[in-house]
């Protein structure tokens, strides 16, 4: 028999979402400001309602059952719509509005000062939380923990980071496309040699750990050529790789998007840029579409629409 929503305490759905996020009765109870016993009783009611265990105990915490996994996206959408409904008055008199972004650094460093000024000008009492883009950022957008992401994707046909492979629930807008360039300090010995593929591969490289991988499309293109670079140092992001490339007493070189010239000028890093020594077809595979990403449930959220427009305008002005 079909069950009526009027017979369900909607607070139980909040408890269910927090259990899915935390995978722990104790942690969920802490976030709800109730006792673990109260959460356990709520879970018992949910199990009876859905006629399913929902979670099973494991040494690593609560593990969701297949039914719970199948409901995760719908539950997140339900909660997001509820938050938007309760936030309606704030769109008229915004107080305490929160902006949560996940962005690639140094891209955010270039525009954050201007973006934050625009946010505070429009929403004086807003709070802003920025996290570095990482392997979990897409899931964070899906879970409703991040309003909008801003990062580069890849164009190589074998890449796992193609725009066409984004989850169906994620919407996006490409703001600009860029090519990676090679960055060397001003007195690097490679600058005294002919700039070709052999010179590029002769020196040790700084790579970044991107989406839990130390290699990316550049390495795929080199593999197609039967070549390989020596990755001597792996760092979390472009910001750190540029900083290290600028340091004296080593011959490391970095590869980062060309837009990083704005970051280098801002911080006066003594770096020189050189194009990758590849032909046009190979460079095409390395094109990076820098993209805004958000959940489709937020496509008409006034806060997100305004934020997208603000970032778009700043990109055209600063990048």
Curated annotation (Swiss-Prot):
| Domain annotation HTH lysR-type: ranges | 8-65
Task: Report the InterPro entries cross-referenced here.
Answer: LysR-type_TF, LysR_subst-bd, Tscrpt_reg_HTH_LysR, Tscrpt_reg_YidZ, WH-like_DNA-bd_sf, WH_DNA-bd_sf, YidZ_PBP2
DNA binding happens at which residues? 25-44
Pfam family membership, one: HTH_1
Looking up SUPFAM superfamilies in the UniProt record yields:
Periplasmic binding protein-like II (SSF53850), Winged helix' DNA-binding domain (SSF46785)
Q: Which PROSITE patterns match?
A: HTH_LYSR
From what superkingdom does this record's organism come?
Bacteria
Family label: Belongs to the LysR transcriptional regulatory family.
The free-text function statement in the UniProt record for this protein reads:
Involved in anaerobic NO protection.
PANTHER family from the UniProt entry = HTH-TYPE TRANSCRIPTIONAL REGULATOR LEUO-RELATED, HTH-TYPE TRANSCRIPTIONAL REGULATOR YIDZ
Q: What is this protein called?
A: HTH-type transcriptional regulator YidZ
Q: Which organism is it from?
A: Salmonella newport (strain SL254)
Query: What gene is this protein a product of?
Result: yidZ
């Amino acid at each position: 028999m079909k069950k009526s929503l009027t017979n369900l305490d909607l607070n139980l759905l909040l408890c269910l979402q927090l259990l899915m996020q935390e995978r722990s009765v104790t942690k969920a109870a802490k976030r709800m400001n109730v006792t673990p016993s109260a959460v356990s009783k709520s879970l018992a009611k949910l199990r009876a309602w859905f006629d399913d265990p929902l979670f099973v105990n494991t040494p690593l915490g609560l593990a969701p059952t297949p039914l719970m996994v199948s409901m995760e996206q719908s539950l997140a959408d339900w909660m997001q719509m509820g938050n938007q409904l309760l936030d309606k008055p704030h769109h008229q008199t915004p107080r305490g509005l929160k902006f949560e972004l996940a962005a690639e650094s140094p891209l955010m460093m270039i525009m954050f000062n201007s973006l934050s000024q625009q946010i505070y000008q429009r929403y004086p009492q807003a709070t802003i939380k920025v996290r570095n883009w990482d392997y979990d950022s897409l899931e964070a957008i899906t879970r409703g923990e991040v309003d909008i992401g801003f990062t580069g994707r890849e164009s190589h046909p074998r890449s796992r980071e193609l725009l066409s492979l984004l989850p169906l629930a994620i919407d996006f807008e490409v703001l600009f496309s860029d090519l990676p360039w090679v960055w060397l300090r001003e007195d690097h010995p490679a600058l005294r040699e002919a700039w070709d593929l052999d010179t590029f591969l002769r020196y040790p490289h700084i790579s970044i750990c991107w989406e839990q991988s130390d290699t990316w499309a550049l390495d795929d293109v080199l593999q197609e050529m039967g070549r390989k670079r020596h990755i001597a140092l792996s760092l979390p992001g472009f910001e750190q790789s540029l900083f290290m490339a600028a340091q004296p007493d080593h011959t490391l070189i970095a590869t980062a998007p060309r837009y990083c010239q704005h970051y280098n000028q801002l911080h006066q890093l003594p770096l020189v840029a050189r194009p990758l020594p590849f032909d046009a077809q190979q460079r095409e595979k390395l094109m990076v579409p820098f993209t805004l990403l958000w959940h489709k449930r937020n496509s008409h959220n006034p806060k997100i629409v305004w934020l997208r427009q603000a970032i778009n305008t700043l990109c055209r002005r600063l990048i």
